[in-house]
Amino acid sequence: MTLWVLGLNHQTAPVELRERAAFAGEALPRALGSLRDTPQIAEAVLLSTCNRTELYAVADSAQALDQWLHTQAGDLQGYLYQHADAEAVRHLFRVATGLDSMVLGEPQILGQVKDAWSTARDHGLLGQRLDRLFQQTFSVAKRARTDTQVGANPVSVASAAVRLAQNAFARLDDSTVLLVGAGETIELAARHLSEGKVRRLLIANRTLAHAQELASRHGGVALPLTELDRHLGEADVVFSATAAREPVIHREMVAKALRTRRHKPMLLFDLAVPRDIEADVATLNDAFLYTVDDLERAVEDNRRGRREAAAEAEAIIDLQVSRFVETQQASAHQAPLRQLRAFGEATRTELLERARQQLANGKPADEVLELLAHGLTNRLLHPPTAALRAAALSGDADLTRAAERLFPATPGYRHPPVRPDDADPAP
């Protein structure tokens, strides 16, 4: 079976297609259950973030992955990429290191990759090949970030949004900021906002306890999501990143909030995929909406500063891909060697025990040694002898040549006459 990755990301597909293929909340365990029930896929890890959905799998063909994704998300042809074996390994190493992210070198993608691996393991989708690959991925990503500056001054989508808000409002410390959600992206936004100070921080979430935990860490006020409509007008800046399948902020909600604010400008950042804020909010006067795709342009300056470090990280990845592939190939080649040695050891143990019993029963030692040597020869040579006979009948010249390399002719050796019991030695 082959190692594959099939996916789409912010470079290949717009947000409306990425949200179709996003697996968040209850959709993720359902998708993993479906993968587990797909016989053509032996192992799988599903990575789904705001900017990418990728299926890493051990399968007979990429068609099995493509059919599964088509069933889950519809026709995505023209927006997908796929890699096999060494290139799949390289792709995962680059993703986990942050070299394939919207914000070059962003740190949280490694945590998301670890979560995807852990979730796959919990759902019984992880086998030896993918487990080894992901364990090595974590090691490579750590080394690349430690040995280069690719992770220096990390900039995420959330921090890029905060920076844009800081540029739009000369003083965020005189502004009210509303965070919708309580996941990792909102946590990052809250952390960056706390560093820069804001006058008032509101945090709304479906699970109030999660909002309260976040509020306690960053000096905010927690709200249930049901009160979002009532408090939206208080916010100068809104950051939203929930796992909802449908928008949580609608055009009419923002229009009402703007009337409450007497059309004082409001900045809204939709950091979620699927989107949290209805797209036509952007048509409202005094409402300025940014999506994750808009942030692609906002973070270009950060990429330029990290390209030199990224080149160093790429060199590390190139070396580690080669080493990983060589290790896997060597491991695959070791399997028949281990099998051969196990067969030899089992044969030796069995016949040696038989010889000891014969000695204990008083049989002469010379006769026992002769029987032992004869038995070992017959038992060890029976499988290759039978295989070579079958090869001769089928015309398998490759096996014959392999036998000639494995058992070269011994100069001066004369074959003994074939005894009747040597003709077809028993296994």
Curated annotation (Swiss-Prot):
Looking at the record, which segments are called Disordered?
407-427
This protein's gene is called hemA
Q: What are the binding positions for NADP(+) in this chain?
A: 181-186
- For this entry, the protein name equals Glutamyl-tRNA reductase
Q: Which family does it belong to?
A: Belongs to the glutamyl-tRNA reductase family.
Keywords noted in UniProt: NADP, Oxidoreductase, Porphyrin biosynthesis
Q: Where is the site labelled Important for activity?
A: 91
- Catalysed reactions listed for this entry: (S)-4-amino-5-oxopentanoate + tRNA(Glu) + NADP(+) = L-glutamyl-tRNA(Glu) + NADPH + H(+)
